[in-house]
């Protein structure tokens, strides 16, 4: 045990210094995770985060614009084949009202997230982006609306979108095909990510921790992919089963493994924008604080209208107590301060 721990610590030291390991070395770190090793990685990750970002934590206002989706991902509560999902689609006026409320609360980044819905066509999305940028020129607009053509991504970028989040979900093609039906393509997902980066978006990828059929090897491949792709953002959170999906009976991912991987991601890329996600706060009450203590530096409170928050149910038990809401920025500030960080009102672009 002692020898394995020493080897693992040496790998973490090397990752801290060189920001790169082999897939086999990442796999070793994942297989030998322990409380002691996670604490060791977290201490180094927080030190690196402080070198780049100080104690600043950036806030993003999340606007869940609709839960209608053409896709049928096996893990997702808003999948097309879920008849139990209470569908909604926000109007342009509702979306702009969310942004106005967020701006008044101090948000300078808005994240428009939703299912792949043909009603939110390229033209509609471009119009929304232009409206928000015209009213709030000092704000960043992030989109998280799934897969489009390169031309569509270019049009949204030209309309003023700054960032795009598209979780890759897994860097292993065989694993991807176990999480998604045959109509969905691993190669197309990767094409989208390359196009986004090439166009000039600040690009975010990410994956679920503990998803069905995930192994130490596939996770190691995720870390290597992120090391090589160099995204501006990376969103990871525990897999949480949703009762109306084919994966309802699979166990959830753990907070412990998620925060350990957050630390490794910070060591891989010290300037990464790394959220402590809502899923982490769902799986344990202090999950987001644990994420910040492991190296995260972004939180994404919910600006969606209260009436729809429960409907955007990607997984069961989603935090909808009010504490995760943007309106409770005071509570959030105190929680962030409790772990030695501070929320800042800023666009929160990546520091290069």
Report residues per predicted region.
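Conserved, mostly hydrophobic/aromatic
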Residues: 18, 45, 73, 112, ...
């Amino acid at each position: 045990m002692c020898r394995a721990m020493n080897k693992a610590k040496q790998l973490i030291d090397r990752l801290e210094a060189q920001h790169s390991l082999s897939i086999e070395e990442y796999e070793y770190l994942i297989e030998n995770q322990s409380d002691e090793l996670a604490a060791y990685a977290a201490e180094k990750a927080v030190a690196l985060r402080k070198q780049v970002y100080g104690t600043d934590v950036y806030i993003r206002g999340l606007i869940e614009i609709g839960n209608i989706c053409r896709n049928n991902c096996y893990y997702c509560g808003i999948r097309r084949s879920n008849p139990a999902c209470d569908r909604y689609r926000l109007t342009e006026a509702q979306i702009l009202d969310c942004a106005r409320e967020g701006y008044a609360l101090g948000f300078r980044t808005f994240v428009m997230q939703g299912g792949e819905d043909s009603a939110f066509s390229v033209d509609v999305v471009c119009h929304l982006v232009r409206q928000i940028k015209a009213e709030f020129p000092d704000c960043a607009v992030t989109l998280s609306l799934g897969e489009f053509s390169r031309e569509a991504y270019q049009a949204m970028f030209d309309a003023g979108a700054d960032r795009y989040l598209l979780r890759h979900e897994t860097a292993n093609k065989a694993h991807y095909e176990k999480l998604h039906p045959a109509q969905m393509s691993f190669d197309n997902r990767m094409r989208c990510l390359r196009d986004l980066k090439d166009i000039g978006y600040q690009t975010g990828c990410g994956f679920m921790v503990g998803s069905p059929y995930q192994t130490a090897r596939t996770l190691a491949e995720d870390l290597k992919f992120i090391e090589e792709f160099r995204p501006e953002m990376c969103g990871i959170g525990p897999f949480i089963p949703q009762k109306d999906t084919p994966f309802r009976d699979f166990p959830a991912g753990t907070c412990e493994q998620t925060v350990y991987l957050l630390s490794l991601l910070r060591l891989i890329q010290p300037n990464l924008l790394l959220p402590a996600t809502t899923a982490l706060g769902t799986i344990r009450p202090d999950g987001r604080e644990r994420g910040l203590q492991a190296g995260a530096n972004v939180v994404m409170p919910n600006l969606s209208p209260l009436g729809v928050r429960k409907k955007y149910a990607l997984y069961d038990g989603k935090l909808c107590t009010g504490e995760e809401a943007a309106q409770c920025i005071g509570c959030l500030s105190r929680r962030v301060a409790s772990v030695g960080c501070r929320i800042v009102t800023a666009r929160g672009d990546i520091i290069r």
